[in-house]
């Protein structure tokens, strides 16, 4: 279920807006994730003590991790579906070290969509949203396939 060239262009155009402030977008994505799905916070030893949104907004560690997450995702998106080399180590660490269920990747995908809608409404119409959702689904499906190869039932 790949994306067309036009869909990838839409995804990468809006991703250019994200790259202008990776740390800020990443922090917003993680805050959205943790607010919508508080159980996900337990997977982050560095952050699980943080309870309030104000604490999250003031956390440099959270901001740095948001930057790391979106930098990695941007590298994957730029491969336009040809991301085997990027997916393999990510799946390995998320399955064996962090034990992140696929469901949590769905949750963070929802958070990404929400943040893009709120920060870039004029650049995130239905066509762009649809393309981004498909790109994130492709990413999740490929991570899930690697999880299966690794014997992780996440």
Curated annotation (Swiss-Prot):
Catalytic class of the enzyme: oxidoreductase
Residues at which heme b binds: 94
Modified residues (Phosphothreonine): 68
Residues holding nitrite: 65
Family: Belongs to the globin family.
Gene name tied to this protein: MB
Binding site for O2: 65
Compartment(s) of residence: Cytoplasm, Sarcoplasm
Coiled-coil portions: none
GO BP term, pick one: removal of superoxide radicals
Protein name: Myoglobin
Leader peptide range in chain numbering: none
Subunit structure of this chain's protein: Monomeric.
Classification via Pfam families: Globin
A GO molecular function held by the record: metal ion binding
Domain of life according to the entry: Eukaryota
EC number: 1.7.-.-, 1.11.1.-
Keyword set, alphabetical order: Cytoplasm, Heme, Iron, Metal-binding, Muscle protein, Oxidoreductase, Oxygen transport, Phosphoprotein, Transport
């Amino acid at each position: 279920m790949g994306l067309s060239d036009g869909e990838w262009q839409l995804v990468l155009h809006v991703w250019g807006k994200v790259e202008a402030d990776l740390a800020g977008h990443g922090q917003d994505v993680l805050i959205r994730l943790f607010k919508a799905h508080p159980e996900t916070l337990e997977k982050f030893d560095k952050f699980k003590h943080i309870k309030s949104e104000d604490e999250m907004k003031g956390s440099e560690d959270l901001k740095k991790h948001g930057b790391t997450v979106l930098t990695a995702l941007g590298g994957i998106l730029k491969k336009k579906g040809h991301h085997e080399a990027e997916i393999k180590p990510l799946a390995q660490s998320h399955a064996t070290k962090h034990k992140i269920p696929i469901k949590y990747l769905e949750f963070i995908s929802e958070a990404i969509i929400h943040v893009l809608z709120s920060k870039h409404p004029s650049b995130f119409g239905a066509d762009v949203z649809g393309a981004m959702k498909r790109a994130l689904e492709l990413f999740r499906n490929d991570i899930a396939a690697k999880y299966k190869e690794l014997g992780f039932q996440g």
